[in-house]
Amino acid sequence: MNKFMGALGIAIVGLGISASVRGAEQSKDTPVTIEYYYKIAPGGMMPGGPSEWLSLYLKNHHPILQQLKKEGLILSEKLYERRFHAESPAWDYKVVMVWLDWSALQEASTREPEIIHALYPDKAVHDREEKRRWELTEKHWDDVLKEVPLE
């Protein structure tokens, strides 16, 4: 299995495992908000235009998330590009997703291969382009957020 699929599997399994631990702190039906950060390798950003990374994300990953949203597992997905570059933490794109609950993360990992097969009949092209997107990614990390009530 290529580097991307391995990384994706590890990320989803890792979130699923941590979901069991963190899920105990929240009710089962509480939405889960995760911020996914991407730092693009030098030369990968196109000033004033879309980056290759963004084009590949929109072509090969966003449709999968849209399908999960149609199925009710994801409540929202928003993509942000950093307007001003701070020194730390350095990131270029942030995706903020609100999942239905912790079990939605586990169900998504089960559904994903079937969704990829349905959306991308030429799996070799999809895998190659996702591999390229990850080659353009210098750093990636996720932050799982817990909302703190203000009242």
Residue spans for each PLM region:
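Core hydrophobic alpha-helical transmembrane segments of single-pass membrane proteins
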Residues: 8-15
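Intrinsic disorder/low-complexity segments
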Residues: 1, 15-17
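Short S/T/G/P-rich N-terminal loop/turn motif that feeds into the first structured element of a domain
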Residues: 17-117, 131-151
